[in-house]
């Protein structure tokens, strides 16, 4: 019977309960865990949640602002392209108008220069014609004297006195 009593003693020392059934330590640890969980839920989670919500709101607002800015940029770019196209058309019209006016001025100056040149040419022709007639008249009047002088030199006789007496008759 000695063997049986050692077996019973060994069974009593090794713990007599089922390990699946909780004992008092488990309930104490569970109570501490629930208290810590309550403290975290009451004082730690709300500020973190608030910061996360503010951050999410800020990100949402930033995305919305970026979308609005992109829309405004696209609208401004479209407007600027329209304004630039209008300005280019106006500049092209002004250039064409200036070219037309330049051509008119150039043709006007050419016609003035041509008229002035024609007037100067006519004036010069008239002056040359008058000078030619005057020179011809001078030569006509001096031809008689020159021919008498030349004849007297060639013949050696003074013809100017003979010519004067023959004209006087």
UniProtKB/Swiss-Prot annotation:
Keywords, ordered alphabetically: ATP synthesis, Cell membrane, CF(0), Hydrogen ion transport, Ion transport, Membrane, Transmembrane, Transmembrane helix, Transport
Organism: Mycobacterium sp. (strain KMS)
Function: F(1)F(0) ATP synthase produces ATP from ADP in the presence of a proton or sodium gradient. F-type ATPases consist of two structural domains, F(1) containing the extramembraneous catalytic core and F(0) containing the membrane proton channel, linked together by a central stalk and a peripheral stalk. During catalysis, ATP synthesis in the catalytic domain of F(1) is coupled via a rotary mechanism of the central stalk subunits to proton translocation.
InterPro entries (UniProt xref): ATP_synth_B-like_membr_sf, ATP_synth_b/b'su_bac/chlpt, ATP_synth_F0_bsu_bac, ATP_synthase_B_chain
Membrane topology: Single-pass membrane protein
Annotated SUPFAM superfamilies: F1F0 ATP synthase subunit B, membrane domain (SSF81573)
NCBIfam families: ATP_synt_b, PRK05759.1-3
Assembly and binders: F-type ATPases have 2 components, F(1) - the catalytic core - and F(0) - the membrane proton channel. F(1) has five subunits: alpha(3), beta(3), gamma(1), delta(1), epsilon(1). F(0) has three main subunits: a(1), b(2) and c(10-14). The alpha and beta chains form an alternating ring which encloses part of the gamma chain. F(1) is attached to F(0) by a central stalk formed by the gamma and epsilon chains, while a peripheral stalk is formed by the delta and b chains.
Family, per entry: Belongs to the ATPase B chain family.
Encoding gene (name): atpF
Top-rank taxon: Bacteria
Name this polypeptide is given: ATP synthase subunit b
GO cellular component: plasma membrane; proton-transporting ATP synthase complex
Molecular function in Gene Ontology: proton-transporting ATP synthase activity, rotational mechanism; proton-transporting ATPase activity, rotational mechanism
Protein's UniProt keywords contain Membrane: yes
